[in-house]
């Protein structure tokens, strides 16, 4: 898909190209609802009239949002006609156009917004973390333990710990509460004891991706409490639309609850603030789009909610952009930016460096720092 326009302004968008980006994974990214072995994403490339190139990555995750690579490409094809010929400096107006053209395709919006912002920042030689506020250039991420059996959980957690990860996000909700409790307990018991000084830093986060009923979620928490398994946070225990269930779990749980699928817009976050139903909210570019995510951040901060920065099954480009946002804004208690580590092969070169748990953005010269090798 390619379109062009000729103009005298160096900031005018002259081309926009969208291509399938298939990223094989080292293992299926199994959650409640699906287990893709390949991330079928989309690469967006915009060119300004002065030749500046910006790149974006859209990462639709069918199991969570219903979006597909095909629907994302179609949405971007429709958006392209409205975007080419516009001035890249009008980023908010361009975001509004994308919301109008593809309201039900947040991954498409996010990928295009990232490409436009990358082009703008490269033209002005500004790193993305600076654009978002410049709070920091370093982050420490957790690592996801995907859904599976007990041996897989133990082996994955031990390998993650050896690689330097002390925060683990454990996917639950694909099995019964009893089976998940057994798996989480075995995982925890298999990690080093208090003799290891790093064990004091260990954090376990559960993520059900809406796979439980309220009764099942509470059953899991009771089983883990009885087994004396410390849980730092329980993310999205029930389905997005089950607000009563979310209220029920939050009121009866001693473990803090985090909303993910239940928080797709600033309006959703406002409801969470007003009801005090959760203690934290997970922000994802692909779930909401870039500028809606920024609005959600402001509402959550004003309302006193804790913050997690997460993602769908994203490659190095989209993950780097999310890292820039979290580092630049600051205020995030939980960082879940690990899916690029599950990608076995990709076409990118990145100045945004991820060494296991550690993100380092200081070496990024402009934009998000990711190019096609």
Give residue spans per PLM region.
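Short secondary-structure boundary segments
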Residues: 57-58, 172, 285, 311-312, ...
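C-terminal alpha-helical cap/extension of soluble enzyme domains
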Residues: 42, 313-371
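Short glycine/serine/threonine/alanine-rich loop segments
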Residues: 85, 126, 255, 305, ...
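Structured loop/turn residues at beta-strand edges in well-structured enzyme cores
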Residues: 11, 163, 229, 276, ...
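Short glycine/serine- and small hydrophobic-enriched flexible loop segments
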Residues: 118-122, 298-301, 323-327
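N-terminal capping/lid subdomain adjacent to the active-site entrance of alpha/beta enzymes
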Residues: 2-205, 209-218, 225, 252, ...
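Catalytic core of soluble alpha/beta enzymes
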Residues: 175-320, 344-354
């Amino acid at each position: 898909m390619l379109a062009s326009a000729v103009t005298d302004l160096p900031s005018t968008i002259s081309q926009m190209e969208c291509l399938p980006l298939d990223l094989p994974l080292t293992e299926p990214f199994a959650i409640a609802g699906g287990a893709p072995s390949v991330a079928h994403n989309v690469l967006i490339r915009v060119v300004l009239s002065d030749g500046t190139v910006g790149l974006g990555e859209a990462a639709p995750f069918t199991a969570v949002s219903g979006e597909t690579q095909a629907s994302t490409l179609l949405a971007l094809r429709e958006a392209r006609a409205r975007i080419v010929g516009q001035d890249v400096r009008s980023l908010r107006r361009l975001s509004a156009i994308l919301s109008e053209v593809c309201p039900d395709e947040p991954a498409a919006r996010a990928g295009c917004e990232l490409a436009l912002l990358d082009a703008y920042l490269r033209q002005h030689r500004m790193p993305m973390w600076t654009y978002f506020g410049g709070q920091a250039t370093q982050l420490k991420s957790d690592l996801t333990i995907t859904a599976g059996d007990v041996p897989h959980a133990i082996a994955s957690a031990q390998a993650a710990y050896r690689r330097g990860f002390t925060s683990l996000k454990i996917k639950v909700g694909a099995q019964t509460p009893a089976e998940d409790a057994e798996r989480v307990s075995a995982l925890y018991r298999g990690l080093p004891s208090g003799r290891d000084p790093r064990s004091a830093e260990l954090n376990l986060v559960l993520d059900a991706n809406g796979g439980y009923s309220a009764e099942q979620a509470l059953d899991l928490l009771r089983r883990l409490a009885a087994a004396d398994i410390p849980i730092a946070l329980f993310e999205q225990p029930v389905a997005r639309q089950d607000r009563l269930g979310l209220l029920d779990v939050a009121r009866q749980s001693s473990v803090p609850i985090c909303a993910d699928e239940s928080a797709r817009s600033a309006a959703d976050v406002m409801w969470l603030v007003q009801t005090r139903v959760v203690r934290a909210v997970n922000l994802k570019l692909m779930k909401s789009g870039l500028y809606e995510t920024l609005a959600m951040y402001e509402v959550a901060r004003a309302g006193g909610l804790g913050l997690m920065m997460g993602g769908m099954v994203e490659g190095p480009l989209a993950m780097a952009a999310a890292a820039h946002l979290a580092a630049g804004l600051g205020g995030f208690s939980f960082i879940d930016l690990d899916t690029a580590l599950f990608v076995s092969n990709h076409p990118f070169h990145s100045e945004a460096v991820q060494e296991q748990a550690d993100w380092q953005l200081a070496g990024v010269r402009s934009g998000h720092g990711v190019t096609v090798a």
